[in-house]
Amino acid sequence: MPLSLGAEMWGPEAWLLLLLLLASFTGRCPAGELETSDVVTVVLGQDAKLPCFYRGDSGEQVGQVAWARVDAGEGAQELALLHSKYGLHVSPAYEGRVEQPPPPRNPLDGSVLLRNAVQADEGEYECRVSTFPAGSFQARLRLRVLVPPLPSLNPGPALEEGQGLTLAASCTAEGSPAPSVTWDTEVKGTTSSRSFKHSRSAAVTSEFHLVPSRSMNGQPLTCVVSHPGLLQDQRITHILHVSFLAEASVRGLEDQNLWHIGREGAMLKCLSEGQPPPSYNWTRLDGPLPSGVRVDGDTLGFPPLTTEHSGIYVCHVSNEFSSRDSQVTVDVLDPQEDSGKQVDLVSASVVVVGVIAALLFCLLVVVVVLMSRYHRRKAQQMTQKYEEELTLTRENSIRRLHSHHTDPRSQPEESVGLRAEGHPDSLKDNSSCSVMSEEPEGRSYSTLTTVREIETQTELLSPGSGRAEEEEDQDEGIKQAMNHFVQENGTLRAKPTGNGIYINGRGHLV
């Protein structure tokens, strides 16, 4: 009786609760499992979905799903409770931040949405699912909140040309996890980085150092920050400003001939560049600026030119960094004076050319005279030498003739050519003979003389004899000479001999 009464007092809800309790004590049903993620990543300020889906057999039902935060070293903190009949119940600490996903909803899906995630939400979360009739299941996941960095760029001190290694700019970014900071630029320099860690984030600072030069002025220097919480890299660009002042120069006097009296529109322009932009000032070194001259920044304009505009003009360029000066000399030309100068120049040129020509002519005359004297002296030396040789030859001939006269058998064979004309006892004056012999010492001589010279020399050899003896000696000499010739058709021809040489009638010596 009591048992039946007790059974009548239990309703279906009581029986379902009892079955859930029994399932929790007996363990999970091997037929079902929970599907979730190990790590859920969300960017700061966005909504985080905490997945928890029960996958079981058909006919199984999910009674409720309980979410709790279970950080290490701390107790479980209730987050929300989803009941199949009574709906969602959120803990007061998360009121207004925990919701169910928008419909349609699956009865087996126990996922929840955590609105507007903050860094404090990072940690581990547990999903506990109670099913019928399989029992209860649980799974854990870790929520990771990314804090995107907010980079900032700070320029360094003022850059000036001529400085050493100087800080150009520094870039700082803080986030969770630590961001990456790099530089994008065409400027040559060096970088250095340092980081600082906080409880929930880390800050990174990178510095860019360079040696300032005017070529860097106006160049971009970009800080690039990379982070997982950013859809794309963040870039901050800084334009470099390097203080400098270039050398000054003045243009307008490239053709000095254009600066003549009466010219209009003449001007001088001062060229320079710098950072900050320089200012220009014109002065005249040898006095004040002439009347009518216009100063327009870097340009100095002149009225129609006169001789009063001649002078030394100075362009003074300056900025906050430095100052420069450049000066030019203006010489306004008078066309009439220029023509006179040109005539004088031509006359001087003609005189110079004439002097040079005269010098060259004198030099030529000297060379001709010297060469003539040289050749004359050379000819005299050759003539003197020839006469000496001829004298020596004649002396040898005298000795040879004397030898022939005294001992004709000791004479070698000779060859003499004579042309017989006129008196049979005389020979032609220009006839010649050649006598070749060898001295006992082995030396040889060749002689050339006329028959008249032979007769004269023969007379000189016998000065003490009478006239009869002289004629007899002459006849004897002629006879001896005729032994070497044959008469043919009124002409004397030399007999063939190994030592004889035929000489023509011109008296050449061979």
Swiss-Prot record:
Residues 32-144 form the Ig-like V-type domain. Residues 1-31 form the signal peptide. It comes from the Eukaryota. The soluble form is produced by proteolytic cleavage at the cell surface (shedding), probably by ADAM17/TACE. Residues 371-510 are cytoplasmic. It is found in: Cell membrane; Cell junction, Adherens junction. Disulfide bonds join 52-127, 171-223, 270-315. GO terms for cellular component: adherens junction; extracellular exosome; plasma membrane. InterPro entries: CD80_C2-set (IPR013162), Ig-like_dom (IPR007110), Ig-like_dom_sf (IPR036179), Ig-like_fold (IPR013783), Ig_sub (IPR003599), Ig_sub2 (IPR003598), Ig_V-set (IPR013106), IgC1_2_Nectin-3-4-like (IPR033320). Residues 399-412 have a biased composition (Basic and acidic residues). Residues 32-349 are extracellular. The keyword Transmembrane helix applies. It is a single-pass type I membrane protein. Predominantly expressed in placenta. Not detected in normal breast epithelium but expressed in breast carcinoma. Residues 148-237, 248-331 form the Ig-like C2-type domain. It is linked to Ectodermal dysplasia-syndactyly syndrome 1: A form of ectodermal dysplasia, a heterogeneous group of disorders due to abnormal development of two or more ectodermal structures. EDSS1 is characterized by the association of hair and teeth abnormalities with cutaneous syndactyly of the hands and/or feet. Hair morphologic abnormalities include twists at irregular intervals (pilli torti) and swelling along the shafts, particularly associated with areas of breakage. Dental findings consist of abnormally widely spaced teeth, with peg-shaped and conical crowns. Patients have normal sweating. This is Nectin-4. The lineage of its organism: Eukaryota, Metazoa, Chordata, Craniata, Vertebrata. The gene is NECTIN4.
